[in-house]
Amino acid sequence: AXAKIALIGAGMIGGTLAA
């Protein structure tokens, strides 16, 4: 995986937890 995929995945998880 690329770094971009990791960043996007982390962002989605963070957004879900924040919501």
Swiss-Prot record:
It comes from Brevundimonas diminuta. One of its GO terms (molecular function) is L-malate dehydrogenase (NAD+) activity. Belongs to the LDH/MDH superfamily. MDH type 3 family. The keyword Transcription regulation does not apply. This is Malate dehydrogenase. Catalyzes the reversible oxidation of malate to oxaloacetate. It catalyses: (S)-malate + NAD(+) = oxaloacetate + NADH + H(+). The gene is mdh. It comes from the Bacteria. The keyword Oxidoreductase applies. GO terms for biological process: tricarboxylic acid cycle. Keywords: NAD, Oxidoreductase, Tricarboxylic acid cycle. The lineage of its organism: Bacteria, Pseudomonadati, Pseudomonadota, Alphaproteobacteria, Caulobacterales. NAD(+) binds at residues 9-14. Its EC number is 1.1.1.37.
